Amino acid sequence: MNWNTKQENVPKPPPYSKTQSSILQHFLMTSTTSQSSFNYSPHNQEASQTSFNYSLHNQEACMYSGNSNSVSQPLLSGRNYITPQTQISVSNMPTRTIVASQSSMERVVSTNGKGPQQPNHNLQTVSSGIMQNVWLPSHTEATISHNPDGGTNMPYMHPPQNQLVTSDTYSMQLQMAPLHSGKVPMTHQGSQGLNHFIPDQLVDWTQYTSNELSYPEYRPPPKQYSYILPATTSLQVKNNQLPTYTQSLQSKHSVPLSSHQYAAEASKRLSALPYSCRYENQHVQNAQPVSKHLPMEVPQSSEVHSSEKKKDTYRGFKQQWQNPNEKVSIGQFSEVKINIKQPYSESVRPSGDGVQALVQNNQEKRKYTYNPNTNQVIDTNATKEKLVRDIKSLVEIKKKFSELARKIKINKSLLMAAGCSKTANTSYTEPIQHSEFSAKEMSAKNGNDCSMELLATCLSLWKNQPSKTTEENVPKPLEEKQCNTSRISTTVVGSANPTNEVHVKSLCSGVGNSQKMMSSSQTVLPVLIPSCESSGVAVGKGTELQIAVVSPLVLSDTNTLPGKDSVPEVLPETLYPVVKEGSVCSLQTQPTETVALPFDVIGAVASNNISAEIPLPVDKEKQHKPIQGDPDIADSSLGKHSPLGTEVLPKPMDSTIVSGPMLQIESICSLAEGDVSYNSQIAEIFNSVQTEPQKPSPNQVIDSQQEQVYDTTENKDFSLQKDKCVQCTDVPHEVPEQPEPLQPEEPASSEYVEANREATEESCREYTGRKESTAKDVCLPAAIQQDPHPRETDMFSKSDHSLPAINEINDESEPISYLHDQLSELLKEFPYGIETFNRHEVSLDQQKTHKIVENQTGGKTSNVSGDSTDQIKITVLNSEQIKELFPEDDQPCDKLAEPENKEIVAEVKSPCDSQIPREESHDLGMLDPEKDKIHCCALGWLSMVYEGVPQCHCSSTEKKEKDQCLDINSSKQGEQPCNSGITIFEINPVSNNSKTPLTQATEEGHFSAVHGEKTKASKTKDNREGQELACHFSAKCYKKDKKGNFKIRHDTSLKMEQKLKNISSKCDIPNPSKCNKIAAPEILHVTTSNSAKNMPFSKQASQESLQKKHTSQDLGPVKAPIELSSNTDPCRSNTSSVQSVSPEKKKLKFKAGGSRLKYFEKRKTDHVIIPDVEIKKKKYEKQEQNKNAGDTLKLCSILTESNERASVQEKTVPSPESSDPKGSSSKSTRVITVQEYLQRQKDKQITGNNASRNICVETVLCDSGHTKTSKHSAAVSWGKLVEGQSISAETAKELEHNSSSHGKDFKIHHSEASRTHSVSNNNKGKFDGKQPDKMFKNKTSMNNESNQMPLQVKEQRKQYLNRVAFKCTERESICLTKLDSASKKLSIEKKSGEYTSKTKDTDKPSMLEFKLCPDVLLKNTSTVDKQDCPGPGPEKEQAPVQVSGIKSTKEDWLKCIPTRTKMPESSQRDSADSRLSKRSLSADEFEILQNPVKESNIMFRTYKKMYLEKRSRSLGSSPVK
């Protein structure tokens, strides 16, 4: 019966409960707080029983039984009789009393000591007017029978054991009331309304109110007095008013009573019990006495009225509440009032001001109670208002408190995940071990515990707050704080190091943690969170710092683990899902090398280059094991993870490989947070705990990389190298000083440690490389970890015997690509997990910085400088560059770079060379450090500020890749260094070309050329570093990208690339100015192209052909085929294309929003901009002089827009390139994307899209006519080439067009730009007519040759390109999305129309006309622009966006048929949906884009489905939230 009755009520209770929260809030918001209280508190008791239980234990059960009762009858009338209660409340507690009268069943029970019981009493009272009267008497008389009305709930409602439950008659309840007042001030009625709504809002306050209403006796039990007893008065009034109402309430109220002893009513009352049943155990005690009191009365009215009066109760309550229907019970009510008055006044005292006022009002009401329902209403209104205000404030307080509690919980969970990190500060050995095991265990446990939620929070915080804030904030407060967390985090992350005793265990904890981190995302992530923040990669705030730190650490583990063949083979996949964290971590970890050592051993190389992970781990193990035996090595392992300290060093020695992964993460901590937090910790640890280990710690960090284990044993030499590296690292101007201040100052020392780490890593790397051939592998793994550059540096040092290692590393580059690809996938899931690119960027930036410093120092051995560059880049970027050098060092770098730039410009001044060298030399000398700071620090921080951490590492990665490519390029042109961070040491582009044959050994010849160029630029060390890095990059590029020339995949590829470069340089050399000029585009191209090595290769292939065509234009068009033959080999194309296209590309790229030079120019502002303007002017003059120059200028402008897109897509597209140097390319992709995004934003903000179009149009003046003719062919053939090279067709198109024939580049860019900007296209057509024939020939030949690119390269680049492009779109948001979308579409278009494009190379001119499509697409706005603009080829792959008529539209595009209106229409919808889905569903989209679109319709449906699902999720979740 009870359940049935309750079920009757149940339908109402659920709505009531549903409405309770809303009603509660609403009533809390409104004056009917009593009603709200009633609605809300029963609901809360249902939903949040615990909260009510806290405040009122009895209330919980009572509230439920009350809720049931009120739901049964007053549920609907719950609001209604809540209103009557409000009237009653007028006398007592208007807000709550009303609820008490009818809703009092629920509310009053809550009011009583036990949250639910008093509401039950009120519900009972509300159920029957007698109940309410009884409530009042029970309150006054302390009747036990009052509890019976909460009978079922009474167990908690010990005091509320009033006859209140009895809905019989007022007399019965009055009897109950005396018992209640004497026993338990069962003023639940009055307090019920208040109580219930207060329990929701503030149980304590309601408790006080209940105390007021409750008798002084009851006042001692605050739980009961939590309910406002004024409601009791109101309840009394209501009871008096409600005979029928009381009966209905009785029937309703009898349900709780029934639990006591009600016969038939008991069953009905039990319906309320379901809620109170939970508390019935406690209530039962009270229920028995209540039953005793109530058994006779309650059954009558409650049973009689239960069914009848439910409806009546609603009506009666409504009426009574609306009208003063309480006259009938006024007399009794008055008596009760008088009784209640005294307890009320007493309760007023304990209650508090609000309660006192309510009590006073209630007392007054009680005085008036006989007549004044109006008075009650008035009092109720005042009380309601007060209650509402109080409730609102309480609710706000509760919300704040819950938020604070949640934050505390999250922080605690993070700290727990960091695990014994707290102790790590005090004791390294214990915390290290503890944190190690804790990191493992906590990673397994906490990582899962906080994995998704914490991860999401961290990611959101991370994206919300750029790591810049974290790193700037973290450097000082967080550095100390995160010194601890970093220690813990490092310990946990590097727990493998402490566990190095169990080498496998440390691998498990490092790799396993990486897996956990990747899988749990927060297993090690919480631990890694501080580490990542200390890395300064890109972390958010205090807790977010941990979050940000986590992603770098996770990335370190993730990227490293992917590289770890043995252990991480399984883990990489597990970790990759967490790539968002892993991406940053791995990239930064690799730069951090020290922490990444185990990963270096197993996965450090593997992280960047999976293929090398097997050979390198062996070498690393070999090297690290010898070093493992050394305490220094152990120190270095621990040093990586400074918190570990030397105390645990022996353990890391046990398993350096194992410690490597953990250390790698920690290295990230010390670098990312070392700059910010972890490095302070390192400085702290090294200063206080390990003053000496501080140097060894960086050394150890490098040693942890296991390449530098040997060097760690030679801590002195290592320290010297470290200092050299740090000093060499001019980019962090403070870093050079850090070697000494390192120990004294934590932030500086942290940075110093980080810088030393990286410098030491590189120094050890290179030193080891000099020391042993094994060190080569070690160096290579270190280089792999920190990016291809360190490896290349090492390779350069021992390029003769290092080539096999390079080959391995190059193979590892593919793992890096895969890692980045996985990172892309992870980025799908975690769009803000872009930190992967930041990671790489950091390492690249550090390398660049180090190399820049080396260039400036010029006295470092290539080994030391290379290693230092890698490590220092991270150090420079992450440590003080991030916290201090971002604003300071970046500007100083700018200043220094500006003088250097001027000097270099003066040195390399040459019609083309001076322009490019100016920019490039400027970038080379100081722009790279500036870049490092800009990207890793300023730009990286901007990227982080803008959209997470990716920029800094992306820039570093991109710089590294570009530096590598530029190093390759710089053999042809020394200017490239400016554009890419590493290219800093490639300041002299002209000499590079001439010197390429000198060091042609493999990449060494290349590097010799670079070195020669740099020597010209007085940067010998930078040359070596550039050579090494370029060597590594060449090896990487050749290995993976040089699929055309797989015969010499590693050594031969390098040699061939060098030969190609030499040929290029020779080809370019005949025209020194042209070579320089080409070098500039090449560098620019390399900047973007190298960031996307595979994609750049195709682009470079085109660029090479263009360059050679440029040279051919000077030297004859025959060279384009030659270069294109090389171009087939992506690596060769990269080198030769970099050579040929470097000057123009450089200019164009730098001018392009995404171009680093342009970005740096903007960063440098006046000086940089002036060189850029000068370069533009000079380029324009040369443009007038040479078609190539003109094309270059056009490309500069177009690249500003289209190259920005191309760069962004190159940077986003680098995933194809990522497949080879995936880590690097992904980083580059992100970096360029962010830079280009910033640049584009700047450009767009300055000129807007139209301005960009206008610029493109202006620059396309020469290419306009040609664009029309060869635009389609260039786009199509280039799309083929790009497809062949697996480069994003559009990006490759842009780059290739930029390089292939700048006219073509402009055409394609314009076709992209035209698609996105039809105005540009029209102007383009006009302006391009200047030299269409030659350009078209070059473009056509280049496109045809480009189309000849191997399909392997094409497909590889294709996949990554799409995913990266979408990443870029999502990351770049609106502006970049447009450009990216167009470029993406172009690439998709080209891919889709790959075969058609190949067949229709001659038809491309019409396709190049993208006017029609852009016009139509322009109509469709940016979405159509983005997705429809690339119409020609991508329509298939853009099918997700453009479903209807996509195929026909594609054909139309190919045929230049303007039947694209259908497509734009569907595309507009689809494009908008797709673009939205791109932004919102990056993960799904990336997956979809990752795999070429099977069908346009299928793709579109998939995108639409994903988008709709995402939107529904977001929309559905937001209201709930």
From Swiss-Prot:
Coiled coil: none annotated. It is found in: Nucleus. InterPro entries: RESF1. It comes from the Eukaryota. The keyword Nucleus applies. One of its GO terms (biological process) is transposable element silencing by heterochromatin formation. Residues 1093-1105, 1124-1142 have a biased composition (Polar residues). The modification Phosphoserine is found at S910, S1142, S1482, S1514. Residues 621-640, 1093-1147, 1204-1230, 1312-1335, 1425-1444, 1457-1485 are annotated as: Disordered. Residues 1325-1335, 1467-1476 have a biased composition (Basic and acidic residues). Residues 1214-1228 have a biased composition (Low complexity). Pfam families: DUF4617. Keywords: Isopeptide bond, Nucleus, Phosphoprotein, Ubl conjugation. GO terms for molecular function: histone methyltransferase binding. There is a cross-link at K223, K1411 (Glycyl lysine isopeptide (Lys-Gly) (interchain with G-Cter in SUMO2)). GO terms for cellular component: nucleus. The modification Phosphothreonine is found at T996. Plays a role in the regulation of imprinted gene expression, regulates repressive epigenetic modifications associated with SETDB1. Required for the recruitment or accumulation of SETDB1 to the endogenous retroviruses (ERVs) and maintenance of repressive chromatin configuration, contributing to a subset of the SETDB1-dependent ERV silencing in embryonic stem cells. Interacts with SETDB1. This is Retroelement silencing factor 1. It comes from Mus musculus (Mouse).
